[in-house]
Design a protein with these regions (language model features):
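Betabetaalpha-Me/HNH-type nuclease active-site subdomain
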Residues: 61
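Glycine-rich beta-strand-to-loop/alpha-helix junction loops that act as flexible
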Residues: 54-58
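Structured mid-to-C-terminal alpha-helical surface segments
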Residues: 1-52, 64-68, 79-341
Length: 341
């Protein structure tokens, strides 16, 4: 990949443009995809490799090929299992204890991002890119790369969103490649990137429980949440993945239990995010916002043949019925906080 970076800018511009033409994508998206893969390669070659796991939309797209939307950022789980805060978490009890743990965990994360993550990123970026922490988001590292192509909505920066409030297991090792290497393998013969990522089954149940929570939301849908509805349906279209997820209902319980502790909100109703009481269909009061958000996302981030929102909702209704028809299990804790009120 470094050989490609060292090519004259005119050659890189032509290769990126031709790749974009083949894939019917914007050149700026192909260019950013290259730099996302480069950052991931350097990240998982660095001393940080054993401290982070790749997750989120970019992971679903690049690692598993489950979604077709262009994802720009890199979501990372930061391992806190060996941190002192674990003892406090394990002994915490009640609302006050949980709040103390959340505050301590947020503080620990900010310290790790500034003291460990940023220096390591700056080290591998060298003079190629610049890395910094935005003042208002201390849990984020922004990497600015040297762009060739301009875009109205694709920023020439990669956002590393780092946080410990996600389960470490199950995870898997995978190899990814930038779009350029897939189209012109002879030009990037060192483009294979090894990453460690959240399992697709866990990602499926994570997304499903997001929709369950949104179905109970008393207020308006947050910005950019239409992507979760699209992602769930695209993942469910992968029959093999869906069958594996359905065969591991215990994992759903663990996901819901974890969220009930770390992302507790009375209206989210995570204790009922299980077979027999799962809700995935959006409530009427968020539909208008969902329609606008989906239309915007479809125009900017989805391929031309992306399904309509009506199609998404139709498949979601079927999925809701399927999940509710699964056999419920006794509540399983397995080293995660319980779901008691």
């Amino acid at each position: 990949m470094n050989t490609f970076i060292k090519r004259p800018s005119g050659e890189r511009e032509e290769i990126i443009y031709q790749t974009a033409q083949r894939l019917n994508m914007e050149p700026a998206a192909v260019e950013k995809d290259f730099w996302v893969c480069w950052v991931l390669r350097e990240l998982f070659r660095s001393p940080l490799a054993h401290s982070v796991i790749f997750k989120g939309g970019t992971c679903l797209s690049k690692v598993y090929g489950l979604i077709a939307r262009f994802s720009e950022d890199i979501d990372l789980i930061l391992d806190w299992r060996g941190a002192e805060i674990v003892k406090e978490w394990q002994s915490s009890d009640g609302k006050v204890g949980r709040k103390k743990v959340m505050e301590a965990l947020d503080e620990w994360n900010i310290i790790q991002v500034a003291g460990t993550i940023l220096p390591a990123v700056q080290q591998f970026c060298g003079e190629l890119c610049s890395a910094s922490i935005p003042e208002k988001t201390p849990e984020v590292v922004l990497i600015n790369y040297p762009r060739i192509f301009e875009s109205a909505y694709i920023r020439p920066e990669i956002k590393l969103e780092i946080g410990p409030k996600a389960a470490w297991d199950p995870n898997e090792a995978h190899i990814i490649k930038p779009y350029i290497a897939e189209q012109y393998p002879h030009l990037l013969n060192d483009a294979e990137v090894m990453v460690r990522a959240t399992s697709a089954e866990r990602a499926f149940w994570e997304k499903v429980t997001i929709l369950h929570a949104q179905a109970q939301r008393p207020s308006e849908l947050p910005e950019r949440y239409a992507r979760h509805y699209y992602d769930v349906v695209m993942m469910a279209r992968n029959i093999a993945l869906k069958q594996r997820a359905y065969a591991d209902v215990e994992l759903l319980y663990r996901v819901a239990s974890f969220k009930h502790y770390f992302y507790r909100a009375g209206w989210a109703d995570y204790p009922n995010a299980k077979p027999g009481s799962m809700h995935l269909m959006p409530d009427g009061h968020i539909m208008e916002k969902l329609r606008l958000d989906y239309a915007s996302m479809k125009a900017e981030m989805l391929p031309a043949d992306a399904p309509s929102l009506e199609c998404i909702l139709g498949e979601l209704k079927t999925l809701e019925a399927e999940v509710n028809a699964l056999k419920p299990l006794p509540l399983h804790i397995s080293n995660y906080p319980d779901m008691q009120p």
